[in-house]
Amino acid sequence: MTKVVKTDAEWQAQLTPEQYYVTRKKGTERAFTGCYWNNKKPGLYSCVCCGTPLFRSETKYDSGTGWPSFWQPLDPNNIRMERDLSHGMVRTEVLCAVCDAHLGHVFEDGPPPTGLRYCINSAALAFVPESAASS
């Protein structure tokens, strides 16, 4: 897997201000404001920064949190995790393995079969509808 490395200026030129804040500065969009939290269409969710496939709609569920939630990544090799001690909490941060974009966090309160909840910012994702993803 080839890493994608860009300067801060290159990321700022490529991304919207919100995408840049979330993915490059480890920000979080407000709950229930992202464009994908309630998306029920079939398709593929990829990294907004580099296009790496991350999640499929089949593993997305309504966690009631206001962020897109998935119980499993498409390919575990496409994400990486780091311990996050920010904001006085201990969490596990989820990042894109290719470009190091901050995606969100993973929690151990998800549904079967994994028991995991990948709580991901909409601003970190690009959605490709199933009809377009299969062509």
Swiss-Prot record:
Coiled-coil intervals, chain numbering: none
Residues spanning the signal sequence: none
Keywords annotated in UniProt: Metal-binding, Oxidoreductase, Zinc
Membrane-crossing residue ranges in chain numbering: none
EC code(s) of this entry: 1.8.4.12
Cofactor note: Binds 1 zinc ion per subunit. The zinc ion is important for the structural integrity of the protein.
Broad enzyme group: oxidoreductase
Active site, UniProt feature: C119 (nucleophile)
Molecular functions (GO terms): peptide-methionine (R)-S-oxide reductase activity; zinc ion binding
Lineage: superkingdom: Bacteria
Biological process terms in GO annotation: protein repair; response to oxidative stress
Catalytic activity: L-methionyl-[protein] + [thioredoxin]-disulfide + H2O = L-methionyl-(R)-S-oxide-[protein] + [thioredoxin]-dithiol
Residues that, per the record, bind Zn(2+): C47, C50, C96, C99
Cellular compartments per GO CC: cytoplasm
UniProt domain MsrB: residue ranges: 8-130
Cofactor annotation: Zn(2+)
Classification via HAMAP family: MsrB
Name under which the protein is recorded: Peptide methionine sulfoxide reductase MsrB
